């Protein structure tokens, strides 16, 4: 079988790929693939691995031998699943590989925002501590998390992991009902109510029609003035212009964003302005520990092996209409 990797550079240069390479006899490895290159590169492929390269209907139509697409990520919005089904192609995604790393990163953002770590570090580097008449600086308000309420939207393994750490800090945890769902389970609260209750709101839901723009201007206005918002889920869930305005106006207390609507943000982004207080933007790196990336590669290798053995796993679309 002939395999094609479309964006190997997105996995980093420091991984052990021996087991993955051993799954197929012939590979074409591409560090990056531009949209106009995709169809030609997969024309002879039986198996394609993509992280973020888009496979649309034209790409599937151009690949008559294609049997399996392995998405080297959890999100699958770069794959036309209907086209995959139409062409009898099985699509598998990867899950769970980054959970410890994303949970760690999420809570690192929460702690940094609550303690105003970037602001105090900048003040020290600017010499403000050296010039202080006292032994400390107290220029920025520090929030103690114990007793505060963590609101979670998206309560899969990531949301549950962050909630577990929050409880260890003495926080109360409240979980939103699934956006777009009818009815609210007894152990959940409506998103609208959670916005008003949460001192820290953390997002771990997928980007769907129900969650696109979920946190917009009206939702930010419902949040507490000192509330913190953290998004390590997907860009597009938060209205970035509205968030920038809310932070400048002091409508909420701070925000940590590991994802943006366009990545990388080549055309600029409202959240990249340098006048926004208590905002931390990280470059979609929450998932990026070596351990997480190696687990991802091993999982993709498993998917290929399982497919060849006739028992594909983590199937999100298949010729049987999955």
Per-region residue spans from a language model:
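Phosphate-binding beta-alpha-beta segment of Rossmann-like dinucleotide-binding domains, i.e.
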Residues: 87, 95-149
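Hydrophobic/small residue at the entry helix of a nucleotide-binding pocket
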Residues: 158
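Rossmann-like adenosine-cofactor binding region
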Residues: 56-61, 172, 178-270
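N-terminal glycine-/charge-rich "phosphate-binding" loop or analogous flexible N-terminal tail
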Residues: 1-47, 170, 174
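Rossmann-like dinucleotide-binding domain for NAD(H)/NADP(H)
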Residues: 91, 226, 232-322
